[in-house]
Regions:
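PEST-like low-complexity, intrinsically disordered acidic/proline/serine-rich tracts
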Residues: 2-6, 11, 17-305
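Cationic, low-complexity basic patches in intrinsically disordered or flexible, solvent-exposed regions
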Residues: 308
């Protein structure tokens, strides 16, 4: 009887594995395609019933762009931001206030261990915009939702005509965002940030006085470009603007990703000469040493296996004080 029960359970597991592994693969009937059936990334921009560009889709950073710094090539072009350094495209770096420059240097010298990404806290929309994990845009009347695979982040951009609340006593990790259409461009203003924010992995700061303007355009089916201006007089001597480029990932969906905080993980973070954190470079080796009973399912895109005994840490890490 036991043997028969075991065989039935084993068969159910075998049958269910292909199903769970394939569920994100679903052809988008709206996607333009070439003669060989591949998605035509240069196809026409999709539009909503009212004629506005439809930003909906699953996106990731372009293969060459947000991961590699590059200065602007013309007066009309803005420097490309990177995941590690949002100001990497500026010849002289970001226009930091003296105290903010000192804070950034301190964060980098500490291997960015207090980055919200390490402690599984919300990253803020700037880090999310350049993150290597995909994000999904859902455009509907009155609101645009951005669902981030990493940290399961959710951001709302209200397009119903409302204004940003004045003197809002409740700061937000993502700020409070309202958008309006200017032709084919969605212009998004965000204010109301928490103090102590991080714009990138290095730790370029964002304070409670920060204000951002993002200009979303979709020049073709496969691309979204975001021109982002940061205006934070407390941390920077002047406003500055960067460009972020996203490419659509057609015929798929975002999946579950869990971040389980662990003090030991933060203490292990060291940077390799390649510029990648050694803790992530060696993730595969560490996972192999974990007992099978504690190993997460293979479709989890996180280092959760190294963080199963995490203590609780709810407070925002110390970010320094303005001088």
């Amino acid at each position: 009887m036991f043997t028969r029960f075991f065989i039935v359970i084993a068969l159910l597991v075998i049958i269910s594995v292909p199903s769970s592994a394939q569920w994100p693969d679903h052809k988008d009937p709206r996607a333009p395609r070439t003669a060989d059936g591949k998605v035509d990334l240069n196809g026409p921009t999709p539009r909503t019933s009212d004629g506005k560009p439809d930003l909906s889709g699953v996106y990731r950073n372009v293969a060459r762009g947000n991961d590699e710094p590059r200065q602007a090539l013309s007066l009309d072009e803005k420097p490309l931001a990177t995941f590690r350094d949002i100001g990497a495209g500026f010849k002289d770096g970001l226009p930091l206030q003296p105290w903010a420059k000192e804070l950034l240097q301190k964060r980098m010298a500490n291997n960015s261990k207090d980055n919200p990404d390490v402690w599984c806290l919300p990253l803020g929309n700037q880090q999310f915009n350049v993150h290597t994990f995909p994000r999904k845009v859902i455009q509907s009347p009155g609101v645009v939702l951005l669902l981030y695979e990493t940290h399961q982040g959710i951001r709302q951009i209200f397009t119903d005509g409302r204004s940003i609340p004045k003197d809002d006593p409740q700061p937000w990790f993502y700020g409070y965002s309202v958008g309006r259409w200017e032709g084919d461009t969605l212009v998004v203003e965000t204010k109301g940030f928490r103090d102590g924010g991080w714009l990138d992995i290095n730790g370029s700061p964002l304070t409670e006085q920060g204000r951002t303007i993002e200009r979303f355009t979709r020049p073709n089916f496969g691309t979204i470009e975001i021109e982002q201006t940061v205006d934070d007089p407390k941390a920077y001597t002047r406003p500055w603007t960067v460009t972020l480029r996203q490419q659509i990932i057609a015929d798929t969906e975002i999946i579950d990703e869990f971040c389980l905080e662990n003090e030991r993980f933060a203490r292990r973070v060291r940077w390799e000469p390649s510029g990648r954190p050694a803790s992530r470079v060696r993730t595969r080796a560490r996972r192999a040493a974990i007992a099978p009973s504690t190993r997460p399912p293979p479709h989890y895109r996180s280092s959760a296996a190294t963080k199963l005994t995490a203590p609780s840490r709810l407070a925002w890490p110390s970010a320094g004080t303005a001088r």
